[in-house]
Amino acid sequence: AINNLKNIDVHLIARKSKKIHDNRTTAISESNLKFLKDNISNLNTKIFWPSKSIQLYYETKNEKINFLNIKEKNKSLMHVYKNEKFKKILLKELKIKKIKVIHKEIKNLNKIKNYDLVILCLGSDSKIYDKITNFRSINKDYKEIAVTGHVKHKLKKINTSQFFLKEGPLAIL
């Protein structure tokens, strides 16, 4: 990936981030972890929590149904990590690879028209996204909210589970 970009100028244009603590986590497969190990020179694999068990539950009016229960003795099914810790590793890797980070907000396409290749990672609320897609996206308001919480515990073994309750999904990672 980044290792193969010799003799190419790469600019990462990003809005100056606000120092907000991010408790979110992400789960990746064994093959994705291998890709990261192969392509990130300063990857600290201690930030990844291997999981050998995945359980999915669905709640009906009268019962909770465990509709998926996968256990593996010899290999990890997925690896969970804190997004904030992984972001720090990626930013350090950008410095090592001499990728120029430009902190500014792009409000129109004229600012980026001189690049040979532009890859945009934008939310659906972006005005640039609207211009590129020509307002062809479909939006639906489900009139629902999501609540994310962080529970600090001292458990040594985490069994990853997801429950589909009548109130909505609950993931324990």
How should each PLM-predicted stretch be described?
Residues 161-173:
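Active-site substrate-recognition segment that forms the wall
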Residues 15-19, 71-74, 153-154:
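A short, flexible beta-alpha/helix-coil linker loop
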Residues 5, 27-29, 134-139:
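Glycine-rich, phosphate-binding/catalytic loops in enzymes
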Residues 19, 108, 125-128, 155, ...:
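Glycine-rich nucleotide phosphate-binding loop and flanking beta-alpha elements
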Residues 2-24:
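Glycine-rich FAD pyrophosphate-binding loop
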Residues 21-59, 147-150:
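N-terminal FAD cofactor-binding segment of flavoenzymes
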Residues 34, 49-132, 138-147:
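Conserved N-terminal helical subregion
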